[in-house]
């Protein structure tokens, strides 16, 4: 046999000598600040109304039923009457959905079943 020379491979590690300067934050502070500024502008443009609603004081909307809380119901014969409405000084007939007066046999008995012997306010009926 012929004499074959042996070749041995040794791993060689080469340490990189260049630096990644593009990844450095310190060199590009202005770019980062510009990006943050652009993000805030975009948030303002697209979410302006939501931000305004979040920071504005919420106005309390008055409940229209609050004006009816002092009104009371009473019976005149078999007719249901409302008195104490703020815009009407006299006793008025209670109206149904079709704008006809509410007439119910044993009207007083019905009102007693709602609130006993105490006067029945419109608020008592609306809460049920």
Swiss-Prot record:
Post-translational modification summary for this protein: Most cysteines are linked by disulfide bonds. They are created by the viral disulfide bond formation pathway, a poxvirus-specific redox pathway that operates on the cytoplasmic side of the MV membranes.
InterPro entries in the record: Poxvirus_L5
Transmembrane segments: 31-51
Topological domain spans for side Virion surface: 52-107
Membrane topology (Intravirion): 1-30
GO cellular component: membrane; viral envelope; virion membrane
Cystine connections: 75-107
Alphabetized UniProt keyword annotations: Disulfide bond, Fusion of virus membrane with host cell membrane, Fusion of virus membrane with host membrane, Late protein, Membrane, Signal-anchor, Transmembrane, Transmembrane helix, Viral envelope protein, Viral penetration into host cytoplasm, Virion, Virus entry into host cell
Principal subcellular localisation of the protein: virion
Function description: Component of the entry fusion complex (EFC), which consists of 11 proteins. During cell infection, this complex mediates entry of the virion core into the host cytoplasm by a two-step mechanism consisting of lipid mixing of the viral and cellular membranes and subsequent pore formation.
Subunit structure: Interacts with OPG086. Component of the entry fusion complex (EFC) composed of OPG053, OPG076, OPG086, OPG094, OPG095, OPG099, OPG107, OPG143, OPG104J5, OPG147 and OPG155. Except for OPG095 and OPG053, each of the EFC proteins is required for assembly or stability of the complex.
Name under which the protein is recorded: Entry-fusion complex protein OPG094
Organism: Variola virus (isolate Human/India/Ind3/1967) (VARV)
Gene name of the encoded protein: OPG099
